Amino acid sequence: MNNRRFDCIGIVGHPRHPAALATHEILYHWLKARGYAVMVEQQIAHDLNLTDAITGSLADIGQKADLAVVVGGDGNMLGAARVLARYDIKVIGVNRGNLGFLTDLDPDNALQQLSDVLEGEYLSEQRFLLETHVRRTNQQSRISTAINEVVLHPGKVAHMIEFEVYIDDRFAFSQRSDGLIIATPTGSTAYSLSAGGPILTPTLDAIVLVPMFPHTLTARPLVISSTSTIRLKFSHITSDLEISCDSQIALPIQEGEEVLIRRSDFHLNLIHPKDYSYFNTLSTKLGWSKKLF
C-alpha cells in the first residue's frame, strides 16, 4: 500500500465513562512517545489535565492535523465527522460504544492496529454527506449536514404528517405517515435499517427514502441517485414539525417553509485497517450466519 503517512494526529471524542477517557490518555502518551505531533480536543485535555498538550477545537484539528482519531461510538464519530468533513483530513475511530459501524479499531488491540495505519497500511474511502435547507421564499435558509440520515418527524407528540415529495423538481409522491427517513449509504445500516430500508454498500452513489409508519400498504422505500435533489412541501402545518440530522441537530419547520435535501459538496475521508471488510463488519454487527464452507 502506497498511502501517505501522518505527522500530526488529532485526538477527538466526548468520553461518557472512565474507560473511554482512559483510552484517550493512553493514546496521547503512546503517540507522543513515538514522536508524533499531537493535538487534543480542548475538553479532553481539560478532563485529563494535559496542561502541556497542544489543544484546539474540532475545526482547529481539521485545519492542522493529518489524521483524527475519534474515540467513542458511532454517535461521537457522527458529531466529529460533520465538522471534519470540511477539511482535508483522514479520520479513523476507536470503538468505545455499542454497535460501531464507523469505529473500526478494537480498544483492546487499537495501538497495534493504529501502528500499522500510521505506517501507511490502511484502506481509504470517501463517504458523502447530505445537506439540508429549511427555507422560505426570499429568506435565508437554515442549513445543516448529516453523515447518516435526515429525518422528517413530529416535534413533540407523535402524529401523522401529510406532505409531498419532489425529486429533481418533479412530483414523486404524496404521503401520510409518521415521518420520512432520507439516508446515505453510510446511514442505511442505522435508523433507516430499523424502519425496513435496504442496506446500500458505501460505494453506491445513492440515497434511500424510507417512510415511517405510512398510512397505506403501498408505501415502500425508494432508492434514487445521490445527485438528485429532494424537496418536501407541506400544504399546511398544524403542529410542531422538525428535520433532524443524525439525531443530533434539529431544525424546526414553520408554516410556509419547505425542506430541500441534496448531496453535500463535503465528504468524509474515512480510513480502515488494512484487513477491513465491509461485509465482515455487516455479518459481525448484524449477527448474520457464517460461511458454510
From Swiss-Prot:
Protein name from the UniProt record: NAD kinase
One GO cellular component term noted in the UniProt record for this chain: cytoplasm
Molecular function terms from GO: ATP binding; metal ion binding; NAD binding; NAD+ kinase activity
Location relative to the cell: Cytoplasm
Cofactor list: a divalent metal cation
The organism's place on the tree of life at top rank: Bacteria
Entry similarity comment: Belongs to the NAD kinase family.
One Pfam assignment: NAD_kinase
Reactions catalysed according to its record: NAD(+) + ATP = ADP + NADP(+) + H(+)
Enzyme Commission number(s) of this protein: 2.7.1.23
Gene assigned in the entry: nadK
Residues annotated as binding NAD(+): 74-75, 148-149, 159, 176, 178, 189-194, 248
Role noted for this protein: Involved in the regulation of the intracellular balance of NAD and NADP, and is a key enzyme in the biosynthesis of NADP. Catalyzes specifically the phosphorylation on 2'-hydroxyl of the adenosine moiety of NAD to yield NADP.
Keywords: ATP-binding, Cytoplasm, Kinase, NAD, NADP, Nucleotide-binding, Transferase
GO biological process, one term: NADP biosynthetic process
Active site: 74
